[in-house]
């Protein structure tokens, strides 16, 4: 808030934040941040890549779950992770989306996803909009995994989300554990 307060009123301001923080599993305080943005005439840019497909009545993410989608200006999401496809998107006012299409080098100098990928993404989004079963199963699996890790006495950081932050504390040991899980069990750990 101090940065917003120190910024001249007539200067454009953007608050960029995440709905689910990937390193520690915390949820972003979307409503609180949106209120702060309104108070200081800033726009909000919400990264929902760890929330879409997993949270909300139709899988639209944490902002949908919390009933605050109308308070966010721009939402960035992925068609990977919860939707199981490839690619990403932004949703927001047409003028913003047009500016990204016109000026963002990563958008301009890339190839559009192939039609089969788009068809798969559309089918996945449509299915998850009407089926809460996958979200329930995902939350159940996450809770069971958290319980198993805690029961094994592993240093799991408490998190409200589906992300399981397991603190190893030594990068060489962490890499060895990650390699073992992949080669011995087919589990990819990031």
Say what each PLM segment does.
Residues 22, 122-126, 161-169:
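A short beta-alpha structural unit
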Residues 64-99:
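Active-site PLP attachment segment
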Residues 104-113:
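A short glycine-threonine-serine/GTX helix/turn-capping micro-motif
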Residues 112-130, 137, 141-144, 150-155:
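Structural motif of enzymes handling amino- and sulfur-group chemistry
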Residues 136-143, 150-185:
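Conserved PLP-binding catalytic core of the aspartate aminotransferase-like
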């Amino acid at each position: 808030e101090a940065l917003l307060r120190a910024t001249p009123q007539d200067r454009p301001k953007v608050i960029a934040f995440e709905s689910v923080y990937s390193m520690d599993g915390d949820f972003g305080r979307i409503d609180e941040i949106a209120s702060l943005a309104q108070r200081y005439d800033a726009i909000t840019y919400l990264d929902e890549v760890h929330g879409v497909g997993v949270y909300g009545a139709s899988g639209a993410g944490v902002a949908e779950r919390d009933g605050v989608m109308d308070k966010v200006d721009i939402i960035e999401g992925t068609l990977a992770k919860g939707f199981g496809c490839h690619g990403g998107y932004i949703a927001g006012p047409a003028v913003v989306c047009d500016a990204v299409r016109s000026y963002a080098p990563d958008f301009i100098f890339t190839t559009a996803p192939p039609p089969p990928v788009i068809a798969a993404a559309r089918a996945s989004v449509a299915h998850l909009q009407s089926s809460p079963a996958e979200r329930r199963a995902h939350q159940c699996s996450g809770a069971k995994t958290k319980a198993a890790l805690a029961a094994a006495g592993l240093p799991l950081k408490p998190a409200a989300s589906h992300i399981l932050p397991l603190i190893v504390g030594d990068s060489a040991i962490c890499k060895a554990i990650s390699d073992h899980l992949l080669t011995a069990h087919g589990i990819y750990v990031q």
